[in-house]
Amino acid sequence: MRLRNGTVATALAFITSFLTLSWYTTWQNGKEKLIAYQREFLALKERLRIAEHRISQRSSELNTIVQQFKRVGAETNGSKDALNKFSDNTLKLLKELTSKKSLQVPSIYYHLPHLLKNEGSLQPAVQIGNGRTGVSIVMGIPTVKREVKSYLIETLHSLIDNLYPEEKLDCVIVVFIGETDIDYVHGVVANLEKEFSKEISSGLVEVISPPESYYPDLTNLKETFGDSKERVRWRTKQNLDYCFLMMYAQEKGIYYIQLEDDIIVKQNYFNTIKNFALQLSSEEWMILEFSQLGFIGKMFQAPDLTLIVEFIFMFYKEKPIDWLLDHILWVKVCNPEKDAKHCDRQKANLRIRFRPSLFQHVGLHSSLSGKIQKLTDKDYMKPLLLKIHVNPPAEVSTSLKVYQGHTLEKTYMGEDFFWAITPIAGDYILFKFDKPVNVESYLFHSGNQEHPGDILLNTTVEVLPFKSEGLEISKETKDKRLEDGYFRIGKFENGVAEGMVDPSLNPISAFRLSVIQNSAVWAILNEIHIKKATN
């Protein structure tokens, strides 16, 4: 009997291992195919860009010829003697060109016409590395000459030393030297090759710099928002630097994260970032934030970089990069007829913050000449007191008295935990969706590691179906209906409420947590997850 049981157990273990291996192989092959398709698409896109450049050049030359022909025609007043030198076909073609106004689609060259002067304007002047592609995460680090101190070497050591061996094979760090002084660039490259020769030869680190022809004339920029001429020039060039770096990095991986050259990182940062992105793979996010400071730790999906770069090119002289990013989100999801709170809720679904921060700013001397910046991320050392999920856009409200600014809105958007003074019978927490949602499951977790006793007790979970009549529900579900149309579907036990939503109740208009009895303790809500049903 023991032998038989052992044989069965061995067989089950073998089958389980085989199925697991088969699933992993299938998943890995699917991922590799996706990356291969992305590379082919981006290679085609680059060929189209080069073709567009040449077409724009020829179009510009042709327009010049047409204008000259018009001028000659006007000066000679259509004299036949002046036109006898042209063949009939040439005269016909020129007549068509001068009589029609062709429509042209605006392109990058409309906003940066100086790029047409040199075909190599969008090709790195210096490029060091073996051109690794097909990774999960590309890290972009722009660096420029600093008058006092460079933090680049320390930043790279922090990033590299906190990577496990297998993680070093799944990412690439691109250092962008935003200078056109070729001697200075070669000096930086020499230092990096000396310090990180192994990482460069392995493909983990790459170094690039733009050609001088990439930059337009930055001497006559309009001063805006009270910034000095020097600061306007600095932020304008910075926008262009970001764009060049993003264009270079786009074809290399699935995600691109923007870093700076004066930061340090937390241990296990790479795995944390990758897992957080995978957790949100079914959501339509645009920016994942792993730091609250400026442009540090902002991660994008590689295909989205096209839209971001195009938008920045349109307004690179107008505003700083972080403002432009917020404008992109506003354009995508905000309704001008709705209020600011509604807009913030919509943007929060595209711009998702991870806490605590994984990157800390350490540079004291800015790349802007003479500027001292004592910027630190206050969330860097904080323990994680809430768990973040992407929830359906909703208007939230509560009858509970909020303690010290720990509001329900911040909790729902993943910014903070909710903390309220002693609940009493009749109190509620309400999540009213902007539009009805098909919900699969729910999870509400109260208390946290600093205040484990501040939990919700004697509290029920209720939902309001969008359809008040005609619901095809079981008698058991029907018995849970309340007078105001809500259905009681669960309750808190040991500070946690979780469960599935009966599909017959979908779509749902609102979730409500109702306090049934007076509580003797305060209440913290540190996790809210209303999971949408997958179609």
Curated annotation (Swiss-Prot):
Residues 1-4 are cytoplasmic. The keyword Amino-acid biosynthesis does not apply. The chain crosses the membrane at residues 5-27. Pfam families: MGAT4_cons, MGAT4A_C. The modification Phosphoserine is found at residue 474. Inhibited by UDP. Residues 28-535 are lumenal. Glycans are attached at residues 77, 458. N-glycosylated. Residues 28-63 form a coiled coil. It is an enzyme of class 2 (transferase). It comes from the Eukaryota. One of its GO terms (molecular function) is protein homodimerization activity. GO terms for biological process: glyoxylate metabolic process; N-glycan processing; protein glycosylation; protein N-linked glycosylation; viral protein processing. Keywords: Coiled coil, Glycoprotein, Glycosyltransferase, Golgi apparatus, Membrane, Metal-binding, Phosphoprotein, Secreted, Signal-anchor, Transferase, Transmembrane, Transmembrane helix. Its EC number is 2.4.1.145. It catalyses: an N(4)-{beta-D-GlcNAc-(1->2)-alpha-D-Man-(1->3)-[alpha-D-Man-(1->6)]-beta-D-Man-(1->4)-beta-D-GlcNAc-(1->4)-beta-D-GlcNAc}-L-asparaginyl-[protein] + UDP-N-acetyl-alpha-D-glucosamine = an N(4)-{beta-D-GlcNAc-(1->2)-[beta-D-GlcNAc-(1->4)]-alpha-D-Man-(1->3)-[alpha-D-Man-(1->6)]-beta-D-Man-(1->4)-beta-D-GlcNAc-(1->4)-beta-D-GlcNAc}-L-asparaginyl-[protein] + UDP + H(+); N(4)-{beta-D-GlcNAc-(1->2)-alpha-D-Man-(1->3)-[beta-D-GlcNAc-(1->2)-alpha-D-Man-(1->6)]-beta-D-Man-(1->4)-beta-D-GlcNAc-(1->4)-beta-D-GlcNAc}-L-asparaginyl-[protein] + UDP-N-acetyl-alpha-D-glucosamine = N(4)-{beta-D-GlcNAc-(1->2)-[beta-D-GlcNAc-(1->4)]-alpha-D-Man-(1->3)-[beta-D-GlcNAc-(1->2)-alpha-D-Man-(1->6)]-beta-D-Man-(1->4)-beta-D-GlcNAc-(1->4)-beta-D-GlcNAc}-L-asparaginyl-[protein] + UDP + H(+); an N(4)-{beta-D-GlcNAc-(1->2)-alpha-D-Man-(1->3)-[beta-D-GlcNAc-(1->2)-[beta-D-GlcNAc-(1->6)]-alpha-D-Man-(1->6)]-beta-D-Man-(1->4)-beta-D-GlcNAc-(1->4)-beta-D-GlcNAc}-L-asparaginyl-[protein] + UDP-N-acetyl-alpha-D-glucosamine = an N(4)-{beta-D-GlcNAc-(1->2)-[beta-D-GlcNAc-(1->4)]-alpha-D-Man-(1->3)-[beta-D-GlcNAc-(1->2)-[beta-D-GlcNAc-(1->6)]-alpha-D-Man-(1->6)]-beta-D-Man-(1->4)-beta-D-GlcNAc-(1->4)-beta-D-GlcNAc}-L-asparaginyl-[protein] + UDP + H(+); an N(4)-{beta-D-GlcNAc-(1->2)-alpha-D-Man-(1->3)-[beta-D-GlcNAc-(1->2)-alpha-D-Man-(1->6)]-beta-D-Man-(1->4)-beta-D-GlcNAc-(1->4)-[alpha-L-Fuc-(1->6)]-beta-D-GlcNAc}-L-asparaginyl-[protein] + UDP-N-acetyl-alpha-D-glucosamine = N(4)-{beta-D-GlcNAc-(1->2)-[beta-D-GlcNAc-(1->4)]-alpha-D-Man-(1->3)-[beta-D-GlcNAc-(1->2)-alpha-D-Man-(1->6)]-beta-D-Man-(1->4)-beta-D-GlcNAc-(1->4)-[alpha-L-Fuc-(1->6)]-beta-D-GlcNAc}-asparaginyl-[protein] + UDP + H(+). Pathway: Protein modification; protein glycosylation. InterPro entries: Glyco_transf_54, MGAT4_A/B/C_C. Its cofactor is a divalent metal cation. Glycosyltransferase that catalyze the transfer of GlcNAc from UDP-GlcNAc to the GlcNAcbeta1-2Manalpha1-3 arm of the core structure of N-linked glycans through a beta1-4 linkage and participates in the production of tri- and tetra-antennary N-linked sugar chains. Involved in glucose transport by mediating SLC2A2/GLUT2 glycosylation, thereby controlling cell-surface expression of SLC2A2 in pancreatic beta cells. Belongs to the glycosyltransferase 54 family. This is Alpha-1,3-mannosyl-glycoprotein 4-beta-N-acetylglucosaminyltransferase A. It comes from Homo sapiens.
